[in-house]
Amino acid sequence: MEFIDYDKQYDVIVVGAGHAGCEAALAAARMGCETLLLTINLDAIALMSCNPAIGGSAKGHLVKEIDALGGEMGKNIDATGIQFRILNTRKGPAVRASRAQADKQLYRLRMKHVMEQQERLSLKQAEVTGIVVEDGEVRGVDTKVGVRYLGATVILTTGTFMRGLIHVGLTNYPGGRAGDLPSVGLSDQLRELGFAVGRLKTGTPARLDGRTIDFTRLEPQHGDDPPVPFSFSTERIDQPQVPCYIAYTNPRSHEIIRSGLDRSPLYAGVIEGIGPRYCPSIEDKVVRFPEKDRHQTFLEPEGRDTVEYYPSGLSTSLPIDIQWAFYRSIEGLERVEIMRPAYAIEYDYVDPIQLHASLETKLVRNLYHAGQINGTSGYEEAAGQGLMAGINAALRVRDKEPLILGRSEAYIGVMIDDLVTLGTREPYRMFTSRAEYRLLLREDNADLRLRERGHAVGLVPEGAYQRFLEKRERIGAELARLKGTKLLPSEADPDFLAAFSLTALQNALTYEQLLRRPDITYEELCRIDPRAAEVPPVVREQVEIQIKYQGYIERQLDQVERARKLEGTRVPAGFDYGALPGLSAEVREKLAKFRPDTLGQASRIQGVTPAAVGILSLALKARG
């Protein structure tokens, strides 16, 4: 097929307009690059294909980090959310996480509007069927209608669209998601270029008609009052909140599900792709946990102006008649109507072990991958990768070094390091347990960790940056004040001393020492320190956490410092592991396969022993 060259060349071309593509395109354009975003359907920009929510455990951390770096996801959910909650409030600050229900259509429309208003960003509807590669470098992309777009860099954010195949029972048909065509040809070309292309599977529940649900028999779940925003730039959430509802499956539901397993593509061997371990279908739960007589579901509204509800935790690929029966077996849903059937989808992905930490591919220069093409699941994981790919493509255009976030700097850094160091054979989801320095990587300090980095690359506007500097200065000043202000036993309020078992106090205590006690909060401190009441809540929170967890934080910082040497030692491209005496054949094979960029990455490859890392370290030192 002959292609017509488009009459404009771009710095960055982004393929796909899901959550990864949106962040990638916005980042590149905001950094001054002429950017083109190509998508199969312009009306599906930032569409929430599965649950109508942003955030959750570890995912909320990712959104905060995206926002701190100058991304859009946090602002978008703040403007379109309909219920906001902080999870794990009874646990420590490291695992507290923000989550919000979204108005699904408003979320999509606002993101599309933001992108349409962005300077240097062009949006076009087209299906990309291949990339243009010359001399090992990407030069542009080809589209189904015969137009070739040329660009200095290309970012693939294809989601579930590459050879997407939708399953409902034993019926299947091509699709990128329900209602959209798949992308055909692109993954075949990637395979021909030498990429290891695999197959994954995910699924989504049915969408239920809220008019046919008896909510009086369900338990409502309300959001926090007042709602806490995601973005560090959002002052408050003004829109009214909407409740979710809790329901449960029962033994009858499970009998119905078992009766349909012979027509389940999952259990009939029709689906080849590997599904998400931590988001199993309801038939998977029933089979794997036969001792459980019920499973919880949250009925989540898809928006204010729609009757559609999303039953979380009830994804399935069972036949439609089994879907009708088992959804209607749930109390409160006896008369429920399905508006959109549940389905599973198989799609191609590219093993992320073939990427550098910048998300540039090792096989084709200037080509970047982000989102589900890398084997991840989740909007937030995709958005974090998209943001980093967009930043690094723009930096490549400027001929600057890439921005690489370390495991001690961000959950985004943990995620990307996991992907490019270990690869994945199943959909990867972020968890706080994946981060070894999670006390340093809290939601509340994402701006303190990353605002400087976002400003340095040009994504954080000057006004937002100045507000951040003022906040940081106030935190430092308050920490110094508390350290230098003392409570004298002779002058202290006797009631305060009695309340906290301090009546026997003989020596003065600083306010810092008082606040370090687990039973004394900032609120309590206000009883004896009028100035504490004047401290803004965001400063107060940060100061209290830093004081109460100081010992733990210092220990983790020591661990980071010890690991820094490994992370900073680069392994040259094409390094000959076969020439290293002392390495076992297994270690040589793994190092040659994974091709780590740094000594730190090498140390995290399964089977590479500390002794092998030591040998490699000595060899690198000898090379100078």
From Swiss-Prot:
Localization per record: Cytoplasm
Cofactor(s) the protein requires to work: FAD
SUPFAM superfamilies: FAD/NAD(P)-binding domain
Binding positions (NAD(+)): 275-289
Gene Ontology MF annotations: flavin adenine dinucleotide binding
Keyword Cytoplasm assigned: yes
Stored InterPro entries: FAD/NAD-bd_sf, GIDA_C_N, MnmG, MnmG-rel, MnmG-rel_CS, MnmG_C, MnmG_C_subdom, MnmG_C_subdom_sf
Source taxon at top rank: Bacteria
Main subcellular location: cytoplasm
GO cellular component: cytosol
Function comment: NAD-binding protein involved in the addition of a carboxymethylaminomethyl (cmnm) group at the wobble position (U34) of certain tRNAs, forming tRNA-cmnm(5)s(2)U34.
NCBIfam families, sorted: mnmG_gidA
Protein name: tRNA uridine 5-carboxymethylaminomethyl modification enzyme MnmG
Organism: Geobacter metallireducens (strain ATCC 53774 / DSM 7210 / GS-15)
Gene behind the chain: mnmG
